[in-house]
Amino acid sequence: MAKKKAFIPFFYFTSIVFLPWLISLCCNKSLKTWITNWWNTRQCETFLNDIQEKSVLEKFIQLEDLFQLDEMIKEYTETDLQQFRLGIHKETIQFIKIHNEYRIHTILHFSTNLISFVILSGYSFWGKEKLFILNSWVQEFLYNLSDTIKAFSILLLTDLCIGFHSPHGWELMIGYIYKDFGFAHYEQILSGLVSTFPVILDTIFKYWIFRYLNRVSPSLVVIYHAIND
């Protein structure tokens, strides 16, 4: 009976880990057809954001330049000009299809992530007792570690998150989140987040050492500073 009770929190933790993947898989299959039909029927003429609008306008400017080039080439025969115009027309249709698919993809991913967040929030709320048990296990495990291992683990974690090479990792992670939500890649926003997050984490971590570790385990702080130096 005790083993069964101990297995329930572990099963709950495993379900939390794999539940987002299952929700994403189910939502992508069930929502894709509905969103595609809704979008194509609605035929919306507004852009989702200014970044996408700028990208589309740049594409149409390129097509306009091609049309101007078409007018400049007068020495071509009428047949060649018709073929040239037909090629531009096909490229325009293909571009519109690609842009339409991109916008459907954006709505699908945003809706899927929103549904996943709501389901996980409700799942976590109804399983608070199991989360408390898991938290007690983690605290007991950390308590049994030596101060040297704790200091080494803290140093390793901080170097990974706010160390010298951390901006590249933040860039990859934030870029993945952007892509997962279906947002367009915007270099200025990405650079701003990459340069801001490590600074915020570093400030929070130093405050945590000053307020919590100095009070709970002064020896751990001494070992941490000795290893860090």
UniProtKB/Swiss-Prot annotation:
Name the record gives this protein: Potassium/proton antiporter CemA
Highest taxon of the lineage: Eukaryota
Family: Belongs to the CemA family.
Keyword Coiled coil attached: no
Molecular function terms, GO-annotated: antiporter activity; proton transmembrane transporter activity
Species of provenance: Nasturtium officinale
Subcellular location: Plastid, Chloroplast inner membrane
Residues that span the membrane, as ranges: 6-26, 107-127, 189-209
PANTHER family with a match to the protein in the record: CHLOROPLAST ENVELOPE MEMBRANE PROTEIN, CHLOROPLAST ENVELOPE MEMBRANE PROTEIN-RELATED
Major place of residence: plastid
Cellular component terms per the entry's GO annotation: chloroplast inner membrane
Enzymatic reactions: K(+)(in) + H(+)(out) = K(+)(out) + H(+)(in)
Membrane topology: Multi-pass membrane protein
GO biological process, one term: potassium ion transport
UniProt keyword terms in alphabetical order: Antiport, Chloroplast, Hydrogen ion transport, Ion transport, Membrane, Plastid, Plastid inner membrane, Potassium, Potassium transport, Transmembrane, Transmembrane helix, Transport
Function of the protein: Contributes to K(+)/H(+) antiport activity by supporting proton efflux to control proton extrusion and homeostasis in chloroplasts in a light-dependent manner to modulate photosynthesis. Prevents excessive induction of non-photochemical quenching (NPQ) under continuous-light conditions. Indirectly promotes efficient inorganic carbon uptake into chloroplasts.
